[in-house]
């Protein structure tokens, strides 16, 4: 019985000590207050560097967009030409998918549908 009582007292003491340590660690020393408007020299420099990088990559972005637009226009024109070739009154005209052209079956030359 004495052994059980000492275990309970030891456990209670450990829980109390743990609670004290936990509650004291939860309180932080907040004696300093820093208010920053976001307009520091470092943030201005960072914004200037980002703007410079954005401007430097502008021409590259324009080239990529132009290339994508050209590829789209080429595919769109090929689709239209295929439709015209398949609906052509010329019976010898056929669509060549590898070259994306309308060709004559007899000569192999390009046909205007």
UniProtKB/Swiss-Prot annotation:
Q: Which domain of life is it from?
A: Bacteria
Q: Name one Pfam family in it.
A: DUF1283
Q: Where is this region: Disordered?
A: 44-67
Q: Where is the signal peptide?
A: 1-28
Q: Which stretches does UniProt call biased (Basic and acidic residues)?
A: 47-59
Question: Keyword Signal: yes or no?
Answer: yes
InterPro entries with a match to the protein in the record: DUF1283 (IPR009700)
List the keywords (alphabetical). Signal
- Membrane-crossing residues? none
> Which family would the database say this protein is a member of?
Belongs to the UPF0482 family.
Q: What is this protein called?
A: UPF0482 protein CKO_01577
Q: What is this organism's lineage? A: Bacteria, Pseudomonadati, Pseudomonadota, Gammaproteobacteria, Enterobacterales
């Amino acid at each position: 019985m004495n052994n059980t009582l000492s275990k309970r007292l030891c456990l209670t003491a450990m829980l109390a000590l743990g609670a004290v340590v936990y509650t004291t660690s939860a309180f932080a020393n907040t004696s300093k207050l820093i208010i920053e408007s976001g307009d520091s020299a470092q943030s201005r420099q960072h914004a200037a560097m980002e703007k410079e990088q954005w401007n430097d990559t502008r021409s590259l972005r324009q080239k990529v967009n132009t290339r994508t637009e050209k590829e789209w226009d080429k595919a769109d024109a090929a689709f239209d030409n295929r439709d015209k070739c398949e609906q052509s009154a010329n019976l010898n005209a056929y669509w060549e998918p590898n070259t994306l052209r309308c060709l004559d079956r007899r000569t192999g030359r390009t046909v205007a549908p």
